[in-house]
Amino acid sequence: CYINNCPLG
């Protein structure tokens, strides 16, 4: 995940 995004769930 990133600071405010979780593309992997």
Curated annotation (Swiss-Prot):
InterPro entries recorded: Neurohypophysial_hormone_CS
Assigned keywords, A-Z: Amidation, Disulfide bond, Hormone, Secreted
Chief subcellular location: secreted
The keyword Disulfide bond belongs to this UniProt entry's keyword annotation: yes
GO terms assigned for molecular function: neurohypophyseal hormone activity
Key word Disulfide bond present: yes
GO cellular component: extracellular region
Modified residues (Glycine amide): G9
Cystine connections: C1-C6
Subcellular location: Secreted
Family label: Belongs to the vasopressin/oxytocin family.
Annotated protein name in UniProt: Aspartocin
Protein source organism: Squalus acanthias (Spiny dogfish)
